[in-house]
UniProtKB/Swiss-Prot annotation:
It comes from the Bacteria. NCBIfam families: psaA. It catalyses: reduced [plastocyanin] + hnu + oxidized [2Fe-2S]-[ferredoxin] = oxidized [plastocyanin] + reduced [2Fe-2S]-[ferredoxin]. PSI electron transfer chain: 5 divinyl chlorophyll a, 1 divinyl chlorophyll a', 2 phylloquinones and 3 4Fe-4S clusters. PSI core antenna: 90 divinyl chlorophyll a, 22 carotenoids, 3 phospholipids and 1 galactolipid. P700 is a divinyl chlorophyll a/divinyl chlorophyll a' dimer, A0 is one or more divinylchlorophyll a, A1 is one or both phylloquinones and FX is a shared 4Fe-4S iron-sulfur center. Belongs to the PsaA/PsaB family. This is Photosystem I P700 chlorophyll a apoprotein A1. GO terms for molecular function: 4 iron, 4 sulfur cluster binding; chlorophyll binding; electron transfer activity; magnesium ion binding; oxidoreductase activity. Divinyl chlorophyll a binds at residues 706, 714. [4Fe-4S] cluster binds at residues 606, 615. It is a multi-pass membrane protein. PROSITE patterns: PHOTOSYSTEM_I_PSAAB (PS00419). Pfam families: PsaA_PsaB. Divinylchlorophyll a' binds at residue 698.
Length: 773
């Protein structure tokens, strides 16, 4: 369904606009439970009830498409805002469940006492049908499922030392969930914000940057300074075999730390751990005597050798500094209270690009209005940014491990990397989806003439054709290197292979960056690194290996020909994903094939009957295809990461990555086949559930092919034969069975393809590293 921009946000034709005196409408929509009993109440067509089975699928597809319910931007905004509170309630319930499991069903205190030998567990399988074999002996007199979420390591970093504290957090999570649910009801039914409130961009930026991000970060820094870092110092001393003495008492166990915790905010106690907490902190702060805080706000760099993680005092310093920057940044914007500061609209309207490289005479004029009226446009940008940030987090989790002992919990490291990569990929595909919707529903060509958006659309053929050329070049060359190596190895000619011992293709730029980082320490060559100790950089760069409990926490990562080859496969798959997603956005409204595509909406299977060769051209179909290539891209990434870390950092596969990963056969034989031995031989062991999951997820993946490889007509013909048989037996249903629409079939197909593929990989990775112990 297409909603033309001029009508969006209008209440009634000819109605006078209400003055913006109050930001909310009181008692906007009384709670009507009768309406909720009627499925599809928001659609005149769906509210009539089902006549065919298509009804249930349309109900799923359109339930959250608020645009199509009323076409009123204010009402849509209110629904989204209310739904945010509901989402937060779900998050708090989820967090509460994690805390509750930690409090009642975990070996958290046992893990705290011996984090290098005891494995984390927070779930116990009930022997309903004899599946108690899944409860492994994880140490600390505990049998249960080994968890790989990293929550134990995170809780230790927070300063949690007992199950009582976890139970308190669980109760707090439920209370917060109730408050959030109440907030969602209140801000839709009792005090619903007006559209003008949602459009006030500068106050929103101030609230987010100053209050949520800035003050939130500083508040967290306060917790780390007064609780997290002192508890970490006490626990680190215990783990190092040299307990600290506080008030004449040796703090020799986590229980001792728990008993001391209520007094950690007492300056007389805290100053025995960090002298700068002796009680003059406020005075030192306001007299700018900030050097007094150098023991609690540090810049040590590197990793704590006891825990193999970043120093807690470095982390508290980071959060304090980041919070201050965010507060300063938030004050940049002009608001209703005073006329000082920047206006986002004024900044964008005067901003112009390079006249030669990007000739758009009107620059960014009209973009502010577009984004302040298009929630899909805003969501697209936010999804792209958060998705990219998630991918950055994935890489920081192993390069700069933030939580104590997380770096030596290899299943958790691999699991968190994979998790954040998938989340990032899905969010970026979502960004393309909502950009396409914004172009179709919210974009008015008459408003955007000769600005940057118009300029990009005019250059779309050049952009896509160049991107296509890049994809072809990368694809043929990167894959060609592997094919060459397979042929040479098959013919017994190793010296003619691209490898570190044959024809070298060294990633000299990446090696140069590594050497630059290492050689700059103690000099003025690297900004901020002048005269700093050698530990100020991550051990990945300065050549050190950090071992904790006999396991490698972090080590230099050597780069060679194998890395250059797989890196170009990454470039290829990512660029193809970009090509598909970007084409779906740039051609969302029109193309040479279908000039009136905007009238057909976001998702449509083909341009009607009688016009062949126009299928899979909708913006939705581009997201559909992009999801497959996103999956392809990230599969290569997580496989590369898994093998590289096992081979060159963790020492699990004897350093075979450099010579085995340079052929397709090597990936199949030495990675997929060799490393699947744990999951394939898992029966009769605690990891047997991963063996079952491995098989089940393969089935889910294969199930998707039934939807992807067949057309709707095949199924409709089959259904009609089955209905005929039911009619003969007089057991025909009153709701007429219909085959899934083409688009619905594709949606079911891609959902099962991704779910099956991700769960298969999940079982493969977990069984591998948990099985190795």
């Amino acid at each position: 369904m297409t909603i033309s921009p001029p009508e969006r946000g209008e209440k009634a034709k000819g109605a006078a606009p209400t003055p913006y005196d109050q930001p909310v409408d009181r008692d906007h929509a009384p709670i009507d439970y009768e309406k909720l009993n009627k499925p599809g109440f928001w659609s005149s067509k769906l509210s009539k009830g089902p006549k065919t089975t298509t009804w249930i699928w349309n109900l799923h597809a359109d339930a959250h498409d608020f645009d199509t319910h009323l076409g009123d931007l204010e009402e849509t905004s209110r629904k989204i805002f209310s739904a945010h509170f509901g989402h937060l309630a779900v998050v708090f319930i989820w967090m509460s469940a994690a805390f509750f499991h930690g409090a009642r069903f975990s070996n958290y205190t046992g893990w705290l006492a011996d984090p290098t030998n005891v494995k984390p567990g927070a779930q116990v399988v009930w022997p309903v049908v004899g599946q108690e074999i899944l409860n492994a002996d994880l140490g600390g007199n505990y049998q249960g499922l080994q968890i790989t979420s990293g929550i134990f390591q995170m809780w230790r970093a927070w300063g949690i030392t007992s199950e009582v504290q976890l139970m308190a957090l669980a109760i707090g999570g439920v209370i917060m969930a109730a408050l959030m649910l109440h907030g969602g009801i209140y801000h839709y039914h009792k005090a619903a914000p007006k559209l003008e409130w949602f459009r006030k961009i500068e106050p929103m930026l101030q609230h987010h940057q100053i209050a949520l991000i800035g003050l939130g970060s500083i508040a967290w820094a306060g917790h780390l300074i007064h609780i997290g870092a002192p508890v970490a110092a006490l626990l680190d001393a215990i783990d190092a075999g040299n307990p600290l003495v506080v008030d004449g008492v040796s703090i020799a166990s986590a229980a001792d730390v728990t008993n001391l915790a209520p007094r950690l905010c007492d300056p007389a106690v805290a100053s025995q751990i960090f002298p700068s907490l002796a009680g003059r902190t406020v005075e030192n702060f306001f007299t700018l005597n900030w050097w007094a805080f150098t023991d609690i706000l540090t810049n040590k760099g590197g990793l704590n050798p006891v825990t193999g993680s970043l120093w807690m005092t470095d982390i508290s310093h980071h959060h304090l500094a980041f919070g201050v920057f965010a507060i300063f940044g938030g004050h940049m914007w002009r608001n209703n209270v005073h006329g000082v500061g920047h206006s986002m609209k004024e900044i964008m309207d005067v901003h112009k690009g390079d006249p030669i490289l990007f000739p758009a005479p009107k620059g960014h004029q009209g973009i502010f209005e577009f984004l302040s009226n298009s929630w899909h446009g805003q969501l697209s940008i936010n999804l792209a940014m958060v998705g990219s940030a998630s991918i950055v987090v994935a890489h920081h989790m192993y390069a700069l491990p933030p939580y104590p002992y997380i770096a030596i919990d290899y299943p958790t490291v691999l699991g968190l990397f994979t998790h954040h990569m998938w989340i990032g990929g899905l969010f970026i595909c979502g960004a393309a989806a909502h950009a396409g919707i914004a172009m179709i529903r919210d974009y008015d060509p008459a408003v955007h003439i000769d600005n940057v958006l118009d300029r990009i659309l005019k250059a779309r053929d050049a952009i896509i054709s160049h991107l296509n050329w890049v994809c072809m070049w990368l694809g043929f060359h990167s894959f060609g290197l592997y094919i060459h190596n397979d042929v040479m190895r098959a013919l017994g000619r190793p010296k003619d292979m691209f490898s570190d011992t044959g024809i070298q293709l060294q990633p000299f730029l990446a090696q140069w960056v590594q050497n630059l980082q290492q050689s700059a320490v103690g000099t003025g060559d690297l900004v901020g690194a002048g005269n700093l100790p050698g530990s100020v950089l991550s051990e990945v760069f300065n050549g050190n290996v950090v071992e904790v409990g006999g396991k490698v926490a972090i080590a230099p990562i050597p780069l060679g020909t194998a890395d250059l080859m797989i890196h170009h496969v990454h470039a290829f798959t990512i660029h193809v994903t970009l090509l598909i997603l970007l084409k779906g956005v740039l051609y969302a409204r029109s193309s040479r094939l279908i000039p009136d595509k905007a009238q057909l909406g976001f998702r449509f299977p083909c341009d009607g009957p009688g016009r062949g060769g126009t299928c899979q051209v909708s913006s939705w179909d581009h997201v559909f295809l992009g999801l497959f290539w996103m999956y392809n891209s990230l599969s290569v990434v997580i496989f590369h990461f898994s093998w590289k870390m096992q081979s060159d950092v963790w020492g699990l596969t004897g350093g075979n990555f450099a010579q085995s990963s340079i052929t397709i056969n090597g990936w199949l034989r030495d990675f997929l086949w060799a490393q699947s031995s744990q999951v394939l031989t898992s029966y009769g062991q605690p990891i047997s559930m991963y063996g079952l999951m491995f098989l089940g997820a393969h089935f889910v993946w294969a199930f998707s092919l039934m939807f992807l490889f067949s057309g709707r007509g095949y199924w409709q013909e089959l259904f009609e034969s089955i209905i005929w048989a039911h009619n003969k037996l007089k057991v025909a249903p009153t709701i007429q069975p219909r085959a899934l629409s083409i688009t619905q079939g594709r949606a079911v197909g891609v959902a099962h393809f991704l779910l099956g593929g991700i769960a298969t990989t999940w079982a493969f990775f977990h069984a591998r590293l948990i099985g190795l112990g």
